[in-house]
Each structure stands twice: as structure tokens, then as C-alpha cells.
Amino acid sequence: MLPSQSPAIFTVSRLNQTVRLLLEHEMGQVWISGEISNFTQPASGHWYFTLKDDTAQVRCAMFRNSNRRVTFRPQHGQQVLVRANITLYEPRGDYQIIVESMQPAGEGLLQQKYEQLKAKLQAEGLFDQQYKKPLPSPAHCVGVITSKTGAALHDILHVLKRRDPSLPVIIYPTAVQGDDAPGQIVRAIELANQRNECDVLIVGRGGGSLEDLWSFNDERVARAIFASRIPVVSAVGHETDVTIADFVADLRAPTPSAAAEVVSRNQQELLRQVQSARQRLEMAMDYYLANRTRRFTQIHHRLQQQHPQLRLARQQTMLERLQKRMSFALENQLKRAGQQQQRLTQRLNQQNPQPKIHRAQTRIQQLEYRLAETLRAQLSATRERFGNAVTHLEAVSPLSTLARGYSVTSAADGAVLKQVKQVKVGETLTTRLGDGVVISEVSAVTKSRKPRKKA
């Protein structure tokens, strides 16, 4: 007997093409770790090698436009991590992988974890600009979360002392490297938020390798920075070092020193501006006095030539009035300058964002309370409806009817018996009781007489 449909018949070319498409579409891009062997580089510049482990191996190719981005020369026996696409070389039917990138195994695994966590947090929206909190301007107190013995703390304190010696600084010491470092950094951020002593935080450390900076690529640290109510400035390593903490922080500074520059006022610059204004005022005063002195000299010379005592007295009186006016004008000018400085200081204080932040925090707390109350009310109503439904279901359940002494009898075909004409002698019946099932065989069928109607 022939099957209803004949099996598909492939040519070798079509088979290889189908397998290649399946590999490329189903597997996609994968990460593979293994040991390099049989490494060759022909004149074309492409790399051909075998990637193997203890029990298996696979042929690999890395084309010139991809391998020129590799920062090291692969060696026989070297453990590497590669990102590759799986494919099939159709002419020979050889299964192979096309390598897109290559890294030494240790650093490569860390880089892979870094990329995976970065993609995860980015998908959750932790890097979105809408969640970035503005930095206070000016800051009234700065919190520093770093190692108390590291160079980063020294650099931060040095810059703050140089730029704004009067700015209070609170240090939350923590480890920045090692297995315990992420947990300590998280606790330091939470402690700073609990105490609420400062209005901006610097979280960071000095430079180092990817392994040295790995504490700032920890998911716990990233979520703690995101959850911080106090604005956070990240300052990890050098300008070329970019960590997950940099993406989550409200502002990323390339170095710890740069972070200190960002959060502090340059009092030396303010002092230079005041000194410059003072110098300009002194120059104006000198110029004014020089002109008046020159005028006085000219008048005095003319009086000496004329020798009239009365005119000399009048000129002296006029000179005194002019000197008083000059002094009064200088005092008024200095007074106006002082008043303008006070107005500028008052406007600067009015721009303090702390009240707005407090109102926003209060609004968030109110919304959280309303959300919790709404959820509790909905949960209570749902539980009540569920209990009523269970009670109703138990009331109409046929099992309850059976438990009161009734039974249900069905024929061999499963039909429920309602009349004796449905049954024949010799048939097997199934009777369902409240606590089980009875199987019986019909030996006789008797139809009951209908009761007589009353006259």
C-alpha cells in the first residue's frame, strides 16, 4: 500500500542550501569559548583556525574587515571568546562558524557580561534621560562614596579645597574592588539617602583594568544609583573607562577630579571677578581724582597769577564742594555696587531646587499610598467574589446531589438513563454513587405502571 504523500527528494546542492539557511536563521549569532589551533593567515589577510575544547572542535574563519579590529595576535593554544555566526560552506558541505569579534577568554567573558547587563538595564529604561535628576547649583554639602585610602578621594578633596574651601564634605568609606565591594557601595548609597545630609553624591574610584572596575558594573550598584533620591555623579577610572554606573548616574564625570569640579563653585574665579571689579573701580577713582586734581592745579595757578584773595577763597570753597560731591558720588557708587551684589545673591538663593524636590517627593509618597490602598481594595473585592462563586458552585455541583443518596446510571455508550426503554436485558450499566462507581448487568426490565388519576 503506497503512502498518501511521497517524501521530499533533495539534491545535494539543495540539501546543503537548506541546512545552511536553517543554521543561519535558527541559531543566529552566538558566543563561543574555546582553544585556538591550526591558526593560519594567507595573503588575503583572512584568519582561518580551529576552535576546540576537550571533546570537540569546529572550523572557524575571521575575515580581514573583522580581524583588523582585534587588538592582539591569536596564538596556538590560546583560550578566547568569540562572537560568531554559524553557517555551512555549501560546495563541500562543511559546517563552520564566521567570527565577528574575538577577545581573550577572561576579559572577554567580563565584556560579555557587561554587554548583557547593559542591554538589560537599557531595556528597562534605567538609562533614560527622563530619570536624570538635576544637580544642585550651588551644592551645600557633597557626599563622597569611595575608598578612604584611594587616590580618588585625595584628588576630590584637593579640588574641592582649591575651588570651594567652605563647602562641607561627608565621606562614606567603602571598598571599591573585590567581592564585597558591590554590597558595601550599595549600603553606602542607601546610608547617604537615609541620613539625607548632602544634596549631591560622588560615587567612584581611580583607574584600573576591567576586573578592577568591575564593582561598578554590578547590577546591584546600578539599581542603587538609580533608586537614589540624591543626585549621583559617577567618577570611575579615567576618561576612557565607561561602566554601567556611568550610564545610570545622573551625570558622568570622566575622572574623580572632574566630578569635584562639577559639584563645586569656583570661589577663586568669583574672587578674581571681585578683584577685577575693585581694580576697575580704583582706576575710575584714580582717573576722576587725577582730573579733579589737574583742574584744581590749573585754577590754583590762575589764582596765583591774579592774586585776588576773594576769588581764591571762592575757588577754594568750590573745590571743597566738588571734593564733597566726589566723595558722595563714590560712596553712592560703592553702595549701589553692594546692593547689586545683594540682589544677585538673593536671586541665586531663590533658584535653590530643594523645595521643588521636596514637593515632588511628597507627591510621589501620596501616589504610592493611593496605589497601595486601591490594590488592597481590589484584592478584597476579588476574594469576596471568589468565595461567593465557590459557594454557588458547591451548591449546584452534582457531586453534592450524589452525596445526599442519589445516583446516576449510564449505559455502555455513556448515555445517562432516564427511561427503562433505554435498557435491554444483558447490557452492562454503570451507576455512580457519592463515594464510587458500581458496574452491573441487567437481568430484567420492568416498567412501572402509571398511577391512576383521581376521579
From Swiss-Prot:
Record EC number: 3.1.11.6
Name of the protein in question: Exodeoxyribonuclease 7 large subunit
Subcellular location(s) per record: Cytoplasm
Reactions listed under catalytic activity: Exonucleolytic cleavage in either 5'- to 3'- or 3'- to 5'-direction to yield nucleoside 5'-phosphates
Gene Ontology CC entries for this record: cytoplasm; exodeoxyribonuclease VII complex
PANTHER family linked: EXODEOXYRIBONUCLEASE 7 LARGE SUBUNIT
InterPro entries: Exonuc_VII_L, Exonuc_VII_lsu_C, OB-fold_nuc-bd_dom
Keywords attached to this entry: Cytoplasm, Exonuclease, Hydrolase, Nuclease
Broad enzyme group: hydrolase
Biological role: Bidirectionally degrades single-stranded DNA into large acid-insoluble oligonucleotides, which are then degraded further into small acid-soluble oligonucleotides.
Principal cellular location given in the protein's record: cytoplasm
Family note: Belongs to the XseA family.
